């Protein structure tokens, strides 16, 4: 089975590792970016991050909103599918629609996440 690369922007290393472990057996390779700093987000322009099929973004990355990160990425021309992961926040549905973001609750259902990725 060919692995599908996705990016996960998440400041909690344990959450990122759990996400990676949950998807690895389902043919998904998670490329972790640990913060929303410009130097880190620059990785999205470099292989293998640049060719990843989708980007998963935590709702809060330190003090930065995942929606702000998504908005910046869209304004920078990134057209890949975005998924916003949150443990309880209720993101603005209009903002999700405007930025073309799929909203997912934590903890993630890895079977559903892998199916959504495979359908891309």
Where are these regions (language model features)?
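Acidic di-acidic motifs
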Residues: 10-12, 106
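Two-component/phosphorelay signaling modules centered on CheY-like receiver
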Residues: 13-35
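CheY-like receiver
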Residues: 25, 71, 75, 111, ...
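Short, structured coil segments at secondary-structure junctions
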Residues: 26, 78, 97-100
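Acidic, metal-coordinating helix/loop segments flanking the phosphotransfer/catalytic sites
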Residues: 32-54
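Conserved phosphotransfer microenvironments
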Residues: 40-42, 55-74, 79
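A short, hydrophobic beta-strand element within the central beta-sheet of small alpha/beta folds
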Residues: 79-90
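Alpha4 helix (beta4-alpha4-beta5 surface) of REC/receiver domains from two-component response regulators
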Residues: 88-105, 111, 115
């Amino acid at each position: 089975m060919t692995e599908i690369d996705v990016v996960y922007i998440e400041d909690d290393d344990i959450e990122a590792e759990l996400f990676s472990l949950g998807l690895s057996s389902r043919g998904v390779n998670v490329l972790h970016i640990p913060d929303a700093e410009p130097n880190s987000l620059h990785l999205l322009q470099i292989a293998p991050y640049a060719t990843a099929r989708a980007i998963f973004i935590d709702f809060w990355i330190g003090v930065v909103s995942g929606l702000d990160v998504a908005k910046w990425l869209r304004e920078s021309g990134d057209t890949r599918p975005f998924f916003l992961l949150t443990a309880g926040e209720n993101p603005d549905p209009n903002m999700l629609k405007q930025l073309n973001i799929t909203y997912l609750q934590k903890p993630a259902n890895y079977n559903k996440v892998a199916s959504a990725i495979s359908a891309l």
